[in-house]
């Protein structure tokens, strides 16, 4: 199932392996859509978020990702950010939060 914000700047879906696939900007408008998808994780295995089609994350989007990481750690698991590009990596580095996630870089 795909969820989309009213401005169509963000869509979130799950693939067959349970990976949360994000398309668009994770900002104040789209953050609640991602938050809703993250709240549906069962907490028994790592949460994998595919960010290959994400080029912008604002502070509210970062808060959403950090909250997911905190909840995962509380349950004894982790959050994997897959397909992280230079724009998103820069935000994580500037904010000193790269250690909160397992990071898999974007190919190419």
What is the meaning of each model-derived region?
Residues 1-56, 67-108:
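STAS-like cytosolic regulatory interaction modules
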């Amino acid at each position: 199932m795909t969820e989309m914000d009213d401005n169509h700047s963000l869509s979130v879906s799950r693939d067959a392996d349970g990976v949360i696939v994000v398309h668009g900007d994770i900002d104040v408008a789209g953050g609640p859509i991602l938050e809703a998808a993250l709240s549906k994780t069962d907490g028994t295995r790592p949460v994998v978020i595919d960010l290959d089609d994400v080029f912008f994350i604002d502070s509210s989007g970062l808060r959403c990702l950090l909250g997911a990481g905190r909840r995962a750690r509380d349950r004894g698991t982790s959050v994997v950010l897959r397909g992280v590009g230079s724009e998103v990596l820069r935000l994580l580095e500037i904010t000193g939060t790269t250690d909160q996630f397992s990071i898999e870089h974007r190919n190419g």
